[in-house]
């Protein structure tokens, strides 16, 4: 059982790093599963759209929701996140060697999100790489 985490100091850098790691591993023939995050800047907002690409080969799922210009709350769409979890679990059960998760955040800390998938991967002796915030 092996679990590792990574974090960077600049916004979006962890997402880019994990995406690059996923691409390199896949290019080397390693069976990967999980998600990497894609942030897309919006002209009409100071906040970006957040999507995740389900590994190894899609789909891309929008995990952020627009709450309006003045909204200050969490923009994560929990239903979209759970859809990504289900898709990632399917790939895990097809014999993945490495699970990559874009972020261990509030949902995981609260027992939701990718938490159970991380535990399942560890029980299956699948290596886990997780992005975290500073």
Pin down the residues of each PLM region:
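Structural motif
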Residues: 97-98
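Sensor-1/coupling segment of RecA-like P-loop NTPase cores
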Residues: 120-134
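N-terminal phosphate/diphosphate-binding loop that engages ATP/GTP or pyrophosphate donors
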Residues: 22-68
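Short amphipathic alpha-helical segments and helix-helix/interface helices
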Residues: 18, 22, 115-122
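Conserved ATPase-coupling elements of RecA-like P-loop NTPase cores
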Residues: 107-114
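Walker B catalytic acidic pair
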Residues: 103
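Helix-adjacent hinge/juxtasegments
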Residues: 55-94
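Glycine-rich P-loop/Walker A and Walker A-like loops and their local beta1-loop-alpha1 context
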Residues: 1-32
